[in-house]
A protein has these predicted regions:
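A positional/architectural concept
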Residues: 1-55
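Charge/polar-rich, low-complexity and marginally structured segments
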Residues: 51, 55-166
Length: 166
């Protein structure tokens, strides 16, 4: 069980801080909920049942784990299928898993494809671009918390790690 002020990764809300644990006003039962405040969205609030098995939540990874993943991104196997439908499905599953490593693999695969396309004057398709943004937002938010830096600084840190791929 998580505690108030813990920072977690939530499947649909990204990186969130647990603002409260209790029974919200809108609930008619005594069921307790986590009240989540997304790190990247100052106005949003998410309520998740305390004992829900249907929702994926995890603690943020450690600073050491993040540093290892970022420093070894060149060794990670990228996720990028030639089949558009299969690729989109793989991306969606990886992003929904909220796993730091899998999201980095998505970013690496799409970044490598973007670089290949740039050489021939082509752009990424909209689906790949959208998935790159989603994975990047999740990783940047988690890095921001882990390294205690701004989202922009986290994006630059990730881009620097990915830059080793180019």
């Amino acid at each position: 069980m998580y505690q108030i002020n813990d920072v977690i990764v939530y499947e649909n809300g990204g990186v969130c801080k647990i603002a409260d644990i209790g029974v919200p006003d809108f609930v008619t039962t005594e069921e307790r909920y986590y009240k989540l405040q997304p790190i990247c969205d100052n106005g949003g609030t998410i309520y998740v049942k305390l004992n829900s098995n249907k929702v994926f939540m995890r603690s943020v990874i450690t600073k050491e784990e993040a540093e290892n993943y970022l420093s070894e991104v060149h060794e990670l196997e990228e996720i990028y299928s030639a089949n558009d439908k299969l690729r989109d499905k793989e991306f969606q599953e990886a992003i929904k898993s909220c796993e730091f490593k899998r999201c980095l693999q998505v970013m690496k695969g799409i970044t490598m494809e973007r670089n290949r396309r740039n050489k021939t004057g082509k752009k990424l398709n909209m689906s790949d671009d959208r998935n790159l943004q989603r994975a990047g937002k999740l990783i940047a938010a988690e890095c921001s918390v882990i390294f205690d830096i701004s989202i922009e600084q986290a994006k630059m840190k990730i881009q620097a790690a990915m830059g080793a791929e180019e």
